[in-house]
A protein has these predicted regions:
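P-loop/Walker-type NTP enzyme "switch/lid" segment
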Residues: 1-71, 169-174
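Conserved catalytic-core segment of NTP-binding enzymes
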Residues: 60, 64, 68-71, 75, ...
Length: 175
């Protein structure tokens, strides 16, 4: 749904043959489109289509894809597009729970709060928080919100904190 980049981040971009759209159109089976990560047993990626149309997969189709994958996998993670447009609504349609990922910046936390409200309005009860790109030195200097600040504002359980790491940026850019 939306832009495709997880294949790049996982180093699987050269293995994409089919996408979720081909599964839905019947051009291929789910097993043909899933890319199994050889380094992580049990991890597979169903790539999104490489197009700009956030509405290319509707909520019923998302539900269908998740139903298919539920037969093989215990956990299915859906990387939602940023924002609160139709792509987001379509992506959350089959969700039982959600992990809201935000950076500790005022604008991002405000957006996360809005997303939490939308998740609750869509009857997703189990919502947790993952804080990404935390810079401890900036927090100490009062130039970035602390984990406690973000937790207090969003008032959902924290599942983890990922510190900023330049190595991740380098790795992502190199593939």
């Amino acid at each position: 749904i939306g832009l495709r980049n997880l294949d790049l981040l996982l180093g699987l971009e050269n293995r994409v043959i089919y996408t979720a759209l081909e599964v839905l159109s019947g051009e291929c089976r789910l097993e043909q489109a899933l890319i199994k990560d050889k380094r992580q047993p049990g991890l597979a990626l169903l790539p999104a289509a490489q197009n700009r149309n956030k509405d290319s997969i509707n909520s019923d189709q998302m539900q269908y894809l998740v139903t298919l994958m539920n037969q093989q996998y215990d956990y299915i993670l859906i990387d939602c597009p940023a924002g609160i447009e139709s792509g987001f609504h379509n992506a959350i349609a089959p969700a039982d729970e959600a992990i809201v990922v935000t950076t500790p910046e005022i604008a991002a936390v405000r957006d996360a709060d809005r997303v939490i409200g939308l998740l609750e309005a869509n009857n997703i009860k189990r919502i947790s928080l993952l804080i990404n790109r935390l810079r401890p030195q900036m927090v100490k200097a009062n130039d970035m919100m602390s984990v406690a600040d973000v937790k207090e504002i969003l008032a959902i359980p924290l599942v983890g904190v990922i510190p900023e790491d330049e190595c991740v940026i380098v790795s992502t850019n190199r593939g």
